[in-house]
Amino acid sequence: KKSDYIKLYVRRVFITDDFHDMMPKYLNFVKGVVDSDDLPLNVSRETLQQHKLLKVIRKKLVRKTLDMIKKIADEKYNDTFWKEFGTNIKLGVIEDHSNRTRLAKLLRFQSSHHSTDITSLDQYVERMKEKQDKIYFMAGSSRKEAESSPFVERLLKKGYEVIYLTEPVDEYCIQALPEFDGKRFQNVAKEGVKFDESEKTKENREATEKEFEPLLNWMKDKALKDKIEKAVVSQRLTESPCALVASQYGWSGNMERIMKAQAYQTGKDISTNYYASQKKTFEINPRHPLIRDMLRRVKEDEDDKTVLDLAVVLFETATLRSGYLLPDTKAYADRIERMLRLSLNIDPEAQVEEEPEEEPEDTTEDTEQDEEEEVDAGTEEEEEEEQETAKESTAEKDEL
């Protein structure tokens, strides 16, 4: 398939349109004409392809194209160009290192600032809160999933704007951008989300951490020993009881889903992958009633099977809330059933009632009925034969 639509003229004489890399792949939708007075006419097309001046032309073509795209009016750009070629621009950020800064200014994303309109990174930076030094983003399979994630709860409550990444290529694109306008990007589903706090707020946080230390240690060393890296008091949760947070170099839930889908298509096993095998941080909300009750129960009896079950159920629901997949859904369903039994005061050991055995059908009456029908049928046949015999005898007498 043809990937370049650039025609080359030398001194207004058509030379060729058979190029393979005059424009990068992400700009394969651009059509144009190049006329040069500096290229030689008396050389073969193969030699011309390797001419050093073509490298300069290629570089200028890309920059001219990006400048031209930048001049498109915002309304027309957002409504028309971005819908058609937005993915191309994102791929350009990933592939074209030399023009990454120019391409970043052309990016558009959904954000918490507006329910329908898309925003540029320039507009996001203009709206940033005072002392905010990072651009916050949340990735998900849809806007609804991203904005309902536990990771954005406190950010939205405090009035921070969050960019929503809803396409598979989005997270790759942002990872390729080290920063924008001096502001680094922060995935809110990973470690590193911090807020400015006063001395009093800091003291309260430290007191809370000390209060919940028995529960945090119990989770890390006993209940969730093989499942998490550590358990900490969360600064990002306001409504949810807990969340599962990836390290800075680990995969978010969205990225893990994408990688697993790609591995499934290629037949690769990612279970041994360094990023996939990294344990995550379990963050708890100290103000949530479930967490407070767990702290009380652990202090009373840390070997209570019900509390152990509850800790694992919380971990598994946090896994789902945080966008990850559960490796063992049956075990999760069994634990939920045990919790339901306890809440309804049903004996955990109560078994399912056995189905009643099917009784054999009573065939005695049917057999007697069949015999009666056979007898009746036989009697009728005998009567018919007697009537026919009588008729024949009468006929013979009449003849005599």
Swiss-Prot record:
The keyword Cell cycle does not apply. Keywords: Acetylation, ATP-binding, Calcium, Chaperone, Disulfide bond, Endoplasmic reticulum, Glycoprotein, Hydrolase, Nucleotide-binding, Phosphoprotein, Sarcoplasmic reticulum. Induction: The synthesis of this protein is stimulated when fibroblasts are deprived of glucose. The modification Phosphoserine is found at residue 44. Residues 346-400 are annotated as: Disordered. The modification N6-succinyllysine is found at residues 1, 230. Homodimer; disulfide-linked. Component of an EIF2 complex at least composed of CELF1/CUGBP1, CALR, CALR3, EIF2S1, EIF2S2, HSP90B1 and HSPA5. Part of a large chaperone multiprotein complex comprising DNAJB11, HSP90B1, HSPA5, HYOU, PDIA2, PDIA4, PDIA6, PPIB, SDF2L1, UGGT1 and very small amounts of ERP29, but not, or at very low levels, CALR nor CANX. Interacts with AIMP1; regulates its retention in the endoplasmic reticulum. Hyperglycosylated form interacts with OS9; promoting its degradation by the endoplasmic reticulum associated degradation (ERAD). Interacts with CNPY3. ATP-dependent chaperone involved in the processing of proteins in the endoplasmic reticulum, regulating their transport. Together with MESD, acts as a modulator of the Wnt pathway by promoting the folding of LRP6, a coreceptor of the canonical Wnt pathway. When associated with CNPY3, required for proper folding of Toll-like receptors. Promotes folding and trafficking of TLR4 to the cell surface. This is Endoplasmin. It comes from Mesocricetus auratus.
